[in-house]
A protein has these predicted regions:
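Glycine-rich phosphate-binding loops that contact phosphosugars or nucleotide phosphates
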Residues: 37, 41, 46-117
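Predominant activation on well-ordered alpha-helical scaffold segments within soluble catalytic domains
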Residues: 11, 29, 33, 53-56
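Short, contiguous, pocket-lining structural segments
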Residues: 2, 24-27, 47
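A short linear-motif detector with a strong N-terminal bias
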Residues: 3, 21-23, 60, 107
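Generic N-terminal amphipathic, Lys/Arg-enriched alpha-helix
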Residues: 1-19
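Surface-exposed alpha-helical segments enriched in charged/polar residues
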Residues: 15, 30-34, 98
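A short, well-structured juxtamembrane/interface segment
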Residues: 20-37
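Short, glycine-rich nucleotide/cofactor-binding loops
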Residues: 14-24, 81-90
Length: 117
C-alpha cells in the first residue's frame, strides 16, 4: 500500500540522518547551549522558506529569540545563526553564512549535499 511505502521511505531517511548527522546534531546543540550559557543569542536566518523557521513558536519547544533581519539585527561573536538552503547553493544564504563565520558567529546550516550534487 502507498502508506506503507511512504512510512518505509520516511524511516529510511530518518535512519540516514541518525547515522550520518548524529555528531553534527550534538555539535549544534552544544553551540546553542554554550551561546545561551554565555549570554549569546540564537537567530534563525529566514532568507528563503527555510526549515529553520520551524524552530520559532513550536508547541512544546523553545521559543527562540527572533529571526535574523539584516537591517535590524547585529550578531556578535558567540551568537548562533541557523540558515538553510536545500541545495547549499543559495547565494544569499552562502554569503550570509560566510560573513557571519568571519565575524565569529557560529553558523548551523540545514542543507542536503546529496540534493546539491
Amino acid at each position: 500500500m502507498l502508506i506503507d511505502r511512504y512510512h518505509e521511505a520516511v524511516e529510511s531517511l530518518l535512519k540516514t540522518v541518525r547515522e550520518t548527522q548524529r555528531d553534527n546534531i550534538f555539535k549544534a546543540g552544544e553551540l546553542v547551549a554554550n551561546a545561551v550559557e554565555n549570554g549569546g543569542k540564537i537567530y534563525l536566518g529566514h532568507i528563503v522558506h527555510g526549515i529553520e523557521m520551524d524552530l520559532i513558536y513550536r508547541g512544546g519547544g523553545p521559543i527562540f529569540y527572533k529571526e535574523y533581519k539584516p537591517d535590524e539585527t547585529e550578531l556578535k561573536e558567540g551568537d548562533v545563526l541557523f540558515v538553510s538552503s536545500v541545495s547549499g547553493r543559495t547565494k544569499a544564504v552562502v554569503d550570509l553564512a560566510w560573513e557571519m563565520v568571519e565575524r565569529g558567529v557560529n553558523v548551523v546550516a540545514f542543507t542536503s549535499m546529496e540534493y546539491a550534487v
